[in-house]
Amino acid sequence: MNNFEKKIVITGSAGFIGFHLSKMLLESGAEVLGIDCLSNYYDVNLKNARTKILKDFNSFKFLKLDLVNEVDTLNSEVESFSPDGIFHLAAQAGVRHSINVPEAYLSNNIVATFNILELSRKIKIKHLIIASTSSVYGANTDMPFNEEQAT
């Protein structure tokens, strides 16, 4: 996977999947703009350590950014980066937490995704990948899960 000369935006770049995807793409020759708000739902020290590793790559730029409340900065930074694709991995995790603090989910999952969709439309992004969670399958008993099942 060498010479992957693409410019990729990864939201949630300090999370587990975002970090490993960023690292793999950087090692493959991509330029990566990592975006994360570094929320304290998971260990911020771990997120900072992951981001520090990514910053060792010359082709990595990091933005500590809230996808809901800093939309103008998001739009201008991503537009000037001129990406070939976006991996939208940022989200508020935790099913139990969604019951206790539903506003966080509405804001961080729905509004943030809407902002990424609008940005993608505006700059005519060629490739947009939005990650989800197995939680969307709910109490489904059919295994393995597949994309045809009700969510």
Predicted regions and their residues:
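N-terminal Rossmann-like NAD(P)+-binding domain of SDR-like oxidoreductases, especially those catalyzing
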Residues: 1-151
